[in-house]
Amino acid sequence: MTTEKSLVTEAENSQHQQKEEGEEAINSGQQEPQQEESCQTAAEGDNWCEQKLKASNGDTPTHEDLTKNKERTSESRGLSRLFSSFLKRPKSQVSEEEGKEVESDKEKGEGGQKEIEFGTSLDEEIILKAPIAAPEPELKTDPSLDLHSLSSAETQPAQEELREDPDFEIKEGEGLEECSKIEVKEESPQSKAETELKASQKPIRKHRNMHCKVSLLDDTVYECVVEKHAKGQDLLKRVCEHLNLLEEDYFGLAIWDNATSKTWLDSAKEIKKQVRGVPWNFTFNVKFYPPDPAQLTEDITRYYLCLQLRQDIVAGRLPCSFATLALLGSYTIQSELGDYDPELHGVDYVSDFKLAPNQTKELEEKVMELHKSYRSMTPAQADLEFLENAKKLSMYGVDLHKAKDLEGVDIILGVCSSGLLVYKDKLRINRFPWPKVLKISYKRSSFFIKIRPGEQEQYESTIGFKLPSYRAAKKLWKVCVEHHTFFRLTSTDTIPKSKFLALGSKFRYSGRTQAQTRQASALIDRPAPHFERTASKRASRSLDGAAAVDSADRSPRPTSAPAITQGQVAEGGVLDASAKKTVVPKAQKETVKAEVKKEDEPPEQAEPEPTEAWKVEKTHIEVTVPTSNGDQTQKLAEKTEDLIRMRKKKRERLDGENIYIRHSNLMLEDLDKSQEEIKKHHASISELKKNFMESVPEPRPSEWDKRLSTHSPFRTLNINGQIPTGEGPPLVKTQTVTISDNANAVKSEIPTKDVPIVHTETKTITYEAAQTDDNSGDLDPGVLLTAQTITSETPSSTTTTQITKTVKGGISETRIEKRIVITGDADIDHDQVLVQAIKEAKEQHPDMSVTKVVVHQETEIADE
C-alpha cells in the first residue's frame, strides 16, 4: 500500500463519502456497544448481520451475497493483521480508529453494490484515514437512513440474545481462536518485518549481575557473580557447594557492621534488600553451634566448626584459661601437622600458628610438650578431641549483644542453644532457658522477655532490656527466634498469611531445624570428602564420614608422659590452670582433686602417680535430685547406713563406665622445680582462687567443713554454689570446689604415729567434665529444712554422709554428700577407688544424679 494509491482512492470516493457522513453521525449512538468488539470480528459480524436482516425479511442469501462474504472475510483477515499494530497505540488514538472502522462497516451493510465497486479501495481508505480526525458532518434526512437505523436497531436484541446464550459464546469464541491461529500462520513477510522492527526498538531489560566476595573460615576469599535479585539462600548454597559441605544448616553468611557486631543474612529475602551499598562482602561463619559436635555426620563439617572456634578464641569471643589454650592448641597442631617429627619440625614450629589472643612463649612450650606426646592421632580424631573440650566452655556458641538493664547498667545479652544469658562484668548473672520463656518481643529499642510463672506464682513476669537502637532490638529478637526454632522445634512454622493492617513482624526462621538437619544428615551416602588442611595443606586421613573416636579404648598419649599439671576452669568446665604447686620445707604432700560431672558423654578420670607412704584419699560425691512438688522429699536418711554396707556387693556396669581421664587430657609436672617457678605456681593458685570467688558466691560453711577443719592437718576453703539446670523441670545442682593452701601447715599438727614428717609437697590438679550451659550461679541458697550427718568407720576407711534438704522456689532438693577417707601404708589403685565410689553412689541412688566427684589425695613421705 502506498500513499499515491490512497490519494486516488480519496478522489474517487469524495462524493460518496459526503452522502455517508450523515448516516454515520446518526448511527454512531446506536453502534457504541458494537465498538467494544475486537477488530478481528468486525467484518464477520457485519456479514452475519446482513444475513440475519435478509432472513427476517423473508429473503434468502444469493450466490452473489456468498461471494461478497468470501471477499469480506479475506479483506477482514488483511485488516486484522494491520489493526494489531494500531492496538499498541495510545488509547485516544485507538478509540478514533475504532470509530472510523465501525462507520465504514456500516457503509458496507447499506449497499452491496458500493462494496463490490470500491471494496479494496475502501479498505485502504479506512486504514489510511483512521488516524485523521474527520470534520463534523451535517445532519441530513433521508428515508434510507431511517431504514438502516431500524435494521441496525433490530440487530441489537439479537446481540443481547447472543450474550445470554453461553453455548453460542463459546462456539463463537472457538471460531475466533481458530481464525486467529490461521492468521498467525498466514502472516506476510512485510508484517513480520514490521514486528521485528518494533521489537528491536523496545528497550531490552537485562538482569544486572552482582559481584560477591565471601571470606571463608580458612582465610581464603570466594568470589562469584550472582543475579541482582538473588536471595540469601542462593549465595549460601553456592558457597557450601564450593566447600563441599552437605550439613549446611549450621552455617550462615554474615554482614559485619563493625569489629564486634554482625547481622546475619536472611536466606528468604533478596540480598539487595539487606545490603547497604554496592560492594557485596560477606563472611562465612557458623551460625548455630551444635551442642554435641560428635553427632555431626561428616568430618569436613567438624573441621570447619574447629576453624570457627579457633577464630573465636583468637578474637577473644571465647575466653579460655591457660591450660585450656595449651590443650586446644596441641590438638590444633596435631590436626594440622600430624605426629611430631624432629626432622620435619623445627624448634619454634608452634609459633607459626595463632593459637591465642596473647600468645606467649610459655604457652608455645606447653603446646609443643603436649603435641610431642600424641601418637598416631588422625586429623579427624584431633578435631573431635578439640571440639569435645571446646564445647565445655561457658561462652561456647553464645551470640553476644550489648544492652542495658532498666537501671541503665551495662550488660551483655547472649543467645545460645539452651536459652538467653545475661552477663555483667564478664560474669553470668542470670539465665532464661527456652522452656521458661513464654514470649519474646521488642518495641522501639526495648527488648522484652515474658517468663513462665513458677509453681507458687500466679502471673507471668516480664523482664525488659534497653538496646542501643531499634535496629539492634530487632536484630536480637530475630536471633532469638532463629535459635529457639532451630534447637527447640522439630519443624519450622509456616509464615502466617498477611492480614489487613496486621501488627508485628512476620519474620520466621525459614531453614531446617536441628532435628530435620540430623534426619537429612543420616541419609548422606557418600565417601568421606578429601579436603586440605588450612596451614599445612594436609589431606584428611579420615576414611569414613563420621569417625567417632572411642575415648574408652584409645589413649593417644603414653603413660610415661612428661609431668605437667593441668586443671579445669570452673567457669567454663574445661581444663584450667597449668600447674599448681606449693612446697613447704621438711614435709611432702600430694593433693589430687578430680571433679567429674555426670554427662551423656563419657567423662574422664585422673591417673595420679603412685605414692610411697601414708595416703589419705577422700571422695566427695554429691547427689542431687529434684522433686516437682514442694512438699515431696526423698526419704533416704534411714536407708543410708544399709546402702553403705551393701555397696561392695553390687557390680553392675554403668553407662558412664569410662570415667577415666585419658592421658591426652593430663598435664603432669616434674617435682623438682626452682624457687622462681614455685612462686609462679603460688600466683597461679591465687589466680585460681580469684576466678572461683568471682564465679561462685560464697555461702556459710557447712557442718562438714567445720568438722573437717578440726581434724584435717591443713586448712581447706570450700566454696559452694547452687546451679539450676535449664532443660525440663527445674533441677538444682551443687558445685563444690576445694582449694588447698598448705603454706601455714605445721609439722606437729599432722596426726600420724608410724611415719615422721620431713617435708611436704602438694600438687593440686583439678578436673571438671562437661559443664553444660544449663548451669549458672544463683545467689538464693534456699531454705534449709533438715541437715543430718551419719558416720561409719572400718579399719581402713571412714565414711561420712551428710544429708541436707532445702526448699527453693517451691522445689525440694535433697543433697547427699559422702566423704570417704581411706588410710593405709600400701599403694592404692586410686583409679579403681574412684570408679568404685561413683558406681556405688549410682547404684544406691538410681533416682538421683551424681553432680560432683572430688578426689583429694594426701601423701606424706618420711626422711630416710
UniProtKB/Swiss-Prot annotation:
Biased composition (Low complexity): 76-87
GO molecular function: 1-phosphatidylinositol binding; actin binding; calmodulin binding; phosphoprotein binding; spectrin binding; structural constituent of cytoskeleton
Annotated spans, Hydrophilic: 494-614
InterPro entries referenced in this protein's UniProt entry, alphabetically: Band_4.1_C, Band_41_domain, EPB4.1_FERM_F1, Ez/rad/moesin-like, FA, FERM/acyl-CoA-bd_prot_sf, FERM_2, FERM_central
Region (Spectrin--actin-binding): 615-713
Gene Ontology biological process terms, A to Z: actin cytoskeleton organization; actomyosin structure organization; cell division; cortical actin cytoskeleton organization; positive regulation of protein binding; positive regulation of protein localization to cell cortex; regulation of calcium ion transport; regulation of intestinal absorption
Taxonomic lineage from the root: Eukaryota, Metazoa, Chordata, Craniata, Vertebrata
Residues recorded as bearing Phosphoserine in the entry: 14, 84-85, 95, 104, 121, 149, 151-152, 188, 191, 521, 540, 542, 555, 664, 674, 684, 709, 712
PANTHER family: 4.1 G PROTEIN, PROTEIN 4.1
GO cellular component: basolateral plasma membrane; cell cortex; cell junction; cortical cytoskeleton; cytoskeleton; cytosol; intercellular bridge; mitotic spindle
Gene: EPB41
Organism encoding this protein: Homo sapiens
Compositional bias annotation for Basic and acidic residues: 61-75, 101-117, 182-199, 587-600
Protein name: Protein 4.1
Main location: cytoplasm
Region called C-terminal (CTD), residue ranges: 714-864
Keywords: Actin-binding, Calmodulin-binding, Cell cycle, Cell division, Cytoplasm, Cytoskeleton, Elliptocytosis, Glycoprotein, Hereditary hemolytic anemia, Mitosis, Nucleus, Phosphoprotein, Pyropoikilocytosis, Transport
